[in-house]
């Protein structure tokens, strides 16, 4: 309340404009409803991780008092899928709206931090910073073109190591290929354990499919709960030797698929930096491309071929645009056989060499 009063004071430095003053208090009130009586100065990184998860589930226009659809509906009803909202189908907010929401919360917490220097509060703000940066990064990238993929993954180029000359480090060989054929984020791939490479039986048959299990077990962290998923392994990855590579590591009693992947502040910046250098030497200099472009290649391929939305979401870990569909899908078990059919249909027209230790 003190913060809102401060920002509503006319003529004060940093005060809200008339339009902003109609929006920001409602966003802050939704934020306050999540934590109840807990003081803002006591908020921690874990609290912010929880709120970020919730921020992606808040319905579009939920905080707008003129939106009559939500009269009598509380955030708790939405998050628990209460009977009161069964008859309401509405969309979740886009990434840009979530980013603006998080920026509003960050400004508030920075204001609190100036008045109460709490170390835990700074870690909470850091969590918001990271998520805002991730949204900016992902939304500003495009997919690689077919020619760019060929340059990066098939042809010789000026990089000292490539798919023609060979790689001395397995993570540099596998990271781009796994991203292209699974749509997984760089952190999701770098943190994989050997136990995440597993065979899963299809519900509709007794056929087992090799899968990559994206989960948050142990020291692993995911962007959202929707990120948990099992992705069948494309035959091109199997032919390139991914299963053999994993088996060799198991024989050496390793635990991680990429033991050399280094995490810092929940990011794998070293691997991202390596790819930036590699792609630059390969001649891909467009700033709208980055490692995340592989994820766009994957989802674009599926969407351009009219793959059903539920299968695209099951493979990519994206959020449904509809809350009702999201809740329904989260409570059903996905048939890995159907997912394998989608993965096996992917053909970028590329030839890949086999990994050699």
Predicted regions located by residue number:
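Catalytic-site neighborhood detector that most strongly recognizes the C-terminal catalytic loop/helix
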Residues: 143, 316-355
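Conserved tyrosine-mediated DNA breakage-rejoining catalytic core shared by Y-recombinases
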Residues: 130, 191-240
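Short, charged phosphate-coordinating catalytic segments
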Residues: 110-124, 171, 179-208, 309-314
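Basic, Lys/Arg- and aromatic-enriched nucleic-acid-binding interface segment
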Residues: 82-103, 123-186, 190
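C-terminal catalytic core of tyrosine-transesterase DNA break-rejoin enzymes
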Residues: 96, 174-177, 181, 270, ...
């Amino acid at each position: 309340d003190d913060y809102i009063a401060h920002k509503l004071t006319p003529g004060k430095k940093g005060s809200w404009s008339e339009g902003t003053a109609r929006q920001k208090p409602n966003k802050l009130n939704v934020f306050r409803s999540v934590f109840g009586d807990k003081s803002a100065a006591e908020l921690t990184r874990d609290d912010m991780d929880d709120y970020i998860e919730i921020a992606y589930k808040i319905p579009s226009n939920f905080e707008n008092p003129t939106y009559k659809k939500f009269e009598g509906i509380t955030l708790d009803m939405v998050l628990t899928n209460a009977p009161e909202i069964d008859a309401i189908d509405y969309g979740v907010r886009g990434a840009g709206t979530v980013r603006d929401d998080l920026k509003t919360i960050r400004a508030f917490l920075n204001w609190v931090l100036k008045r109460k220097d709490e170390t835990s509060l700074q870690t909470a703000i850091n969590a918001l910073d990271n998520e805002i940066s991730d949204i900016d990064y992902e939304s500003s990238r495009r997919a690689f073109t077919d020619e760019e993929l060929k340059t990066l993954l098939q042809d010789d180029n000026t990089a000292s190591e490539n798919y023609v000359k060979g790689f001395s480090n397995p993570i540099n060989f596998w990271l781009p290929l796994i991203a292209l054929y699974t749509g997984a984020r760089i952190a999701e791939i770098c943190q994989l354990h050997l136990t995440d490479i597993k065979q899963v039986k299809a519900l509709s048959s007794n056929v087992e499919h090799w899968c990559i299990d994206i989960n948050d077990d142990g020291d692993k962290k995911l962007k959202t709960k929707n990120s948990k998923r099992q992705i069948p392994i494309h035959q091109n990855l199997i032919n390139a030797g991914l299963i053999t590579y994993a088996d060799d590591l198991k024989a050496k009693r390793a635990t991680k698929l990429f033991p050399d992947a280094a995490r810092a502040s929940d990011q794998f910046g070293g691997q991202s930096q390596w790819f930036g250098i590699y792609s630059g030497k390969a001649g891909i200099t467009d700033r709208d491309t980055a490692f995340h472009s592989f994820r766009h290649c994957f989802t674009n391929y599926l969407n351009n071929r009219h793959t059903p939305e539920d299968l695209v979401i099951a493979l990519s870990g994206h959020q449904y645009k509809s809350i009702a569909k999201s809740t329904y899908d989260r409570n059903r078990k996905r048939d890995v056989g159907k997912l394998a059919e989608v993965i096996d249909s992917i053909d970028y027209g590329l030839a890949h060499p086999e990994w050699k230790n």
